[in-house]
Structure formats: structure tokens, C-alpha cells
């Protein structure tokens, strides 16, 4: 056993807000649709808020292609729906090139009378990824072709 006695550091820890990556600068994004009032930049920005919303109903895709291979230790997804009663499912995939592996899959039920916000934060160990993909099915209670719900994303953050 190697042991050292050290004095506590007076330096403050770096706030997590400063650790989130600047996705607008390091990635190119592909989306399946976009409401012009809620562009994807609003969900990926570290400064702008307002989130992204799909222009069409049913399942949607957000795919990030990174300029350089990336290591990711934390992933945060934030969804908000204050008006609809619905069950949503999302899945995150990541990898290099066409080889993507599922990282997480999660379902959530929104209700205007209570459950209006979902924030999921995951500790991951991804290295050398060039692509991150988010698939959102905004309404698990219907056949995707019959869904009347619009997918939305308040924010996506990586550290």
C-alpha cells in the first residue's frame, strides 16, 4: 500500500456546466424533422434554451457526427412536455462509423398533472466515438404510423 498525506485543496471544483462539450462546435447533426420555431441548435447549445421539436409526428432521429473521435464520460438528456398524456421511449446508440451499439433505452410517462419533465444523466465509458444517435418514439401507446405526438428534446449534453 502506498500512502501520502496531503492537505485539502483550496481550489474550487470546476462547475459541471463548464465541463459540457460545445456540441455546436465539434459536431455535425442530422435530424429526421424540425419545427422551425424549435431548431435542434436550441437543444445542443450550452447557452440558448428552448429545445428542439419535430415538425412531423411519430418516431424521430437525431444523429451527431463528431469532427474528431470523442471520449464521453457523461450523457444528459432533458425532455419536457407540460401538455400531453403520453408514454415515450428513447434509445441512445454510439460508436465509430457504421458500428453503433445501444448505450441506453428508457421509457417515461408524461402527465400534465404531475410528470412533466424527465432528466436522465448517465455515467458512461465511451472512447473513440464518431457518431452518437438518439431515437425518440414520442408515443409508445400507438402504432408509430398512427402517432399524433411530436417528439421534443429540451437538451442533450455530453462531458
Regions found by a protein language model. Name each.
Residues 1-65, 82-84, 157:
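Disordered, acidic Ser/Thr/Pro-rich linker "stalks" and the adjacent N-terminal cap
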Residues 91-93, 108, 149-152:
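Short amphipathic alpha-helical segments embedded in low-complexity Lys/Glu-rich regions
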Residues 70, 83-87, 127:
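A cross-taxa feature marking solvent-exposed loop/turn segments within ectodomains of secreted
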Residues 79-88, 142:
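Extended, low-complexity, turn-rich repeat/linker tracts enriched in Gly/Pro/Ser/Thr and Asp/Glu
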Residues 29, 61-64, 72-78, 119-149, ...:
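Hydrophobic/aromatic beta-strand segments within beta-rich folds
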Residues 55-57, 85, 115-117, 149:
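Short solvent-exposed loop/turn micro-motifs enriched in small/polar/acidic residues
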Residues 101-125:
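Extracellular carbohydrate recognition and processing domains
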Residues 85-98:
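Short, surface-exposed beta-strand/strand-loop-strand elements in extracellular ectodomains
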Amino acid at each position: 500500500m502506498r500512502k501520502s498525506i496531503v492537505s485539502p485543496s483550496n481550489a474550487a471544483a470546476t462547475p459541471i456546466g463548464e465541463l459540457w462539450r460545445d456540441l455546436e462546435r465539434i459536431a455535425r447533426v442530422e435530424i429526421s424533422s424540425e419545427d422551425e420555431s424549435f431548431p435542434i441548435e436550441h437543444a445542443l447549445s450550452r447557452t440558448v434554451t428552448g429545445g428542439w421539436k419535430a415538425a412531423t409526428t411519430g418516431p424521430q432521429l437525431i444523429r451527431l457526427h463528431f469532427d474528431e473521435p470523442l471520449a464521453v464520460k457523461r450523457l444528459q438528456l432533458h425532455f419536457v412536455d407540460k401538455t400531453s398524456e403520453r408514454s415515450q421511449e428513447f434509445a441512445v446508440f454510439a460508436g465509430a462509423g457504421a458500428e453503433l451499439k445501444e448505450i441506453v433505452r428508457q421509457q417515461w410517462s408524461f402527465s400534465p398533472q404531475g410528470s412533466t419533465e424527465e432528466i436522465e444523466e448517465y455515467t458512461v465509458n465511451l472512447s473513440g466515438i464518431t457518431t452518437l444517435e438518439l431515437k425518440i418514439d414520442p408515443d409508445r401507446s400507438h402504432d408509430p404510423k398512427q402517432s399524433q405526438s411530436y417528439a421534443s428534446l429540451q437538451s442533450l449534453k455530453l462531458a
